[in-house]
Amino acid sequence: MSAALKPLAQLDTPRLTHLQRLEAESIHIMRETVAETENPVMLYSIGKDSSVLLHLALKAFAPGRLPFPLLHVDTTWKFREMIAFRDARAKELGLDLLVYTNPDGLARGIGPVSHGSEVHTDVMKTQALRQALDKYKFDAAFGGARRDEEASRAKERIVSLRTAQHRWDPKRQRAEPWHLYNLKKKRGESLRVFPLSNWTELDIWLYIEQERIPIVPLYFSAERPVVRRDGQLIMVDDERLPLEPGETPELRKVRFRTLGCYPLTGAVESDAATLPEIIGETLAARTSERQGRVIDKDGAGAMERKKQEGYF
């Protein structure tokens, strides 16, 4: 029987692995978005998901340069190692990196310690992101959010329509059958695009190991100065974190499953100092990686409310 007449199941076609399928889907989403929008940008938060997203983008558009810039919304409260890693990667890869900080929030001295997590996140993240998107007139923004991270992200589409005020309305979500993505929008509207939506935390780590993707050292276990506060191990990254009465930083072997502003990000005690050890911990984990993110605890439905206000 000729190959043309063989049943599809009998054709000697190479089978893609699980990670190859995820990679192909993400690359397709990126290329489709670039083809259908005028001025896209990639949000770069410096974490493991952003590192994977950047790696996929470099693959998607190789051997050419990325057809969009990277945007980092800098709250001024990221871990020092994160900023050093960001600058080193941008220099190494020759990236077009935009760094934006809310000037009003900076002038008012808004911070997670002085104003609390909710005000800090709104002013220095949500408002700052909206300002940056408006300033540079971006009509589509790639992000590294995944559906397995948190409930509101689980129900958001891969291509998420935002209003002219950058708000997300869950009732206006579009169907995405057969990997078909509707990238149409009215004047003033914009899109948030999530190529990693169908990845899990385990997928991310397996891909990082497979592709040897550089990541911030904070993900690996090491002795770090921490204080226990409200059930979280908070790293004392610089002198701006005031110690409460009776608090004394102590060195513990910890690492971070997720990264954000350091006073709002809890570490986990761990001996995992290599990628295989991190993968083993991830397989055994019974809690979400975002259990250490204080901003997710700002009341019931906190993340969905933030997204409706323009948060990523």
From Swiss-Prot:
Pathway: Sulfur metabolism; hydrogen sulfide biosynthesis; sulfite from sulfate: step 1/3. It catalyses: sulfate + ATP + H(+) = adenosine 5'-phosphosulfate + diphosphate. The keyword Endoplasmic reticulum does not apply. Gene3D superfamilies: HUPs. The keyword ATP-binding applies. One of its GO terms (biological process) is sulfate assimilation. Its EC number is 2.7.7.4. It holds the Pfam family PAPS_reduct. Keywords: ATP-binding, Nucleotide-binding, Nucleotidyltransferase, Transferase. One of its GO terms (molecular function) is ATP binding. HAMAP family: Sulf_adenylyltr_sub2. Belongs to the PAPS reductase family. CysD subfamily. Heterodimer composed of CysD, the smaller subunit, and CysN. With CysN forms the ATP sulfurylase (ATPS) that catalyzes the adenylation of sulfate producing adenosine 5'-phosphosulfate (APS) and diphosphate, the first enzymatic step in sulfur assimilation pathway. APS synthesis involves the formation of a high-energy phosphoric-sulfuric acid anhydride bond driven by GTP hydrolysis by CysN coupled to ATP hydrolysis by CysD. This is Sulfate adenylyltransferase subunit 2. It comes from Methylobacterium nodulans (strain LMG 21967 / CNCM I-2342 / ORS 2060).
